[in-house]
UniProtKB/Swiss-Prot annotation:
<dbReference type="GO" id="GO:0071973">
    <property type="term" value="P:bacterial-type flagellum-dependent cell motility"/>
</dbReference>
<keyword id="KW-0975">Bacterial flagellum</keyword>
<protein>
    <recommendedName>
        <fullName>Flagellar hook-basal body complex protein FliE</fullName>
    </recommendedName>
</protein>
<comment type="similarity">
    <text>Belongs to the FliE family.</text>
</comment>
<dbReference type="InterPro" id="IPR001624">
    <property type="entry name" value="FliE"/>
</dbReference>
<dbReference type="Pfam" id="PF02049">
    <property type="entry name" value="FliE"/>
</dbReference>
<dbReference type="GO" id="GO:0003774">
    <property type="term" value="F:cytoskeletal motor activity"/>
</dbReference>
<dbReference type="GO" id="GO:0009425">
    <property type="term" value="C:bacterial-type flagellum basal body"/>
</dbReference>
<dbReference type="GO" id="GO:0005198">
    <property type="term" value="F:structural molecule activity"/>
</dbReference>
Length: 114
């Protein structure tokens, strides 16, 4: 078994094989370019949050009605009332967790040094 010697590496050969670094061009359409676009995205997010909180509020109201109906004897289905209360409890718990995560993220951003 014969071994071939390793050819020496010349710096000029390395430079010929390297491609020059190209300028980074921003990608067109990669995000809102104007304050109007940013305001629209903010409004959409605000609308989304408002709708989500409205759904949580509606579930809480349904649970209140179900528990009141169960207490007064108007609702005979125990499982319907329990399901409504569990939905309301879970949705409120999720809402509180999302709020806590958002506050943690805000505090983390505020701790960043510029």
């Amino acid at each position: 078994m014969a071994f071939n010697p390793i050819a020496p590496v010349h710096p000029l050969m390395l430079q010929q094989n390297l491609n020059p670094i190209q300028e980074n061009n921003p990608v067109e359409g990669s995000g809102p370019q104007t304050p109007a676009g940013a305001a629209k995205v903010g409004a959409d997010f605000g609308q989304f949050l408002q709708e989500a909180l409205q759904k949580v509020d509606n579930l809480q109201k349904e649970a209140d009605v179900a528990s009141l109906g169960l207490a007064t004897g108007q609702i005979q289905d125990l499982h319907t009332a329990v399901i409504a209360m569990e939905k309301a409890g879970l949705s409120l718990s999720l809402t509180v967790d999302v709020r806590n995560r958002a506050l943690d993220a805000y505090h983390e951003i505020m701790r960043m040094q510029i």
